[in-house]
């Protein structure tokens, strides 16, 4: 079992029950999935960029990526419907907990001038999004072998009904929020 999942079951559930007064442990919010997305607008001109970005995302997450395609044509961006414009990975179960553990304890401290993640990027329904400016914060990526520094979006989807519940869940899981 992943270290963070074990910690969730033993420490986080009782803490959330006492804080929010849940009557049943099944009412406690749980993480459903983590979606890691890389939008690559420059992939329109050069398709090889997409391959290298997909390889990096596979190394970071340990799971096969899905290539995202344009939903509609946009003439100003020289974009046609069906063109590959990014890649994404959806992590669930054990891999989700392992990724979050690595992200919190290894990757986030490697960000320059890191003072904590923003507490304001909840969506109103208990989901949290983080933007990462460079993929080199992950230890799986070797700085010498990358072509270009790319960012990514990380969305943490929870079963929480409110932002306060989701914030408490992530805080107990170890996400360092800015005060």
UniProtKB/Swiss-Prot annotation:
Chaperone among keywords: no
Lineage, top ranks: Bacteria, Pseudomonadati, Thermodesulfobacteriota, Syntrophia, Syntrophales
Name assigned to this protein: Large ribosomal subunit protein uL5
Quaternary structure and interacting proteins, as annotated: Part of the 50S ribosomal subunit; part of the 5S rRNA/L5/L18/L25 subcomplex. Contacts the 5S rRNA and the P site tRNA. Forms a bridge to the 30S subunit in the 70S ribosome.
Keyword terms: Ribonucleoprotein, Ribosomal protein, RNA-binding, rRNA-binding, tRNA-binding
GO CC aspect terms: ribonucleoprotein complex; ribosome
Family: Belongs to the universal ribosomal protein uL5 family.
Chain's role: This is one of the proteins that bind and probably mediate the attachment of the 5S RNA into the large ribosomal subunit, where it forms part of the central protuberance. In the 70S ribosome it contacts protein S13 of the 30S subunit (bridge B1b), connecting the 2 subunits; this bridge is implicated in subunit movement. Contacts the P site tRNA; the 5S rRNA and some of its associated proteins might help stabilize positioning of ribosome-bound tRNAs.
HAMAP family xrefs: Ribosomal_uL5_B
Gene: rplE
């Amino acid at each position: 079992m992943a270290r963070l999942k074990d910690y969730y079951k033993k420490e986080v559930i009782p803490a959330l029950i006492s804080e929010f007064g849940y009557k049943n442990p099944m009412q406690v919010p749980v993480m459903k999935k983590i979606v890691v997305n890389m939008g690559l607008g420059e992939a329109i001109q050069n398709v090889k960029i997409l391959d290298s970005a997909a390889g990096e995302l596979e190394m970071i997450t340990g799971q096969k990526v899905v290539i995202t395609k344009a939903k509609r044509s946009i003439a100003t961006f020289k974009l046609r419907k069906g063109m590959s414009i990014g890649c994404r990975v959806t992590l669930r179960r054990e891999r989700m907990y392992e990724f979050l553990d690595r992200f919190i304890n290894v990757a986030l401290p490697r960000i320059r001038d890191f003072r904590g993640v923003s507490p304001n990027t909840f969506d109103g329904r208990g989901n949290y999004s983080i933007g990462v400016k460079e993929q080199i914060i992950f230890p799986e990526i070797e700085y010498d072998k990358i072509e270009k520094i790319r960012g990514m979006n990380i969305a943490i989807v929870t079963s929480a009904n409110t932002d306060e519940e989701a914030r408490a869940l992530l805080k107990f899981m170890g996400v360092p929020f800015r005060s």
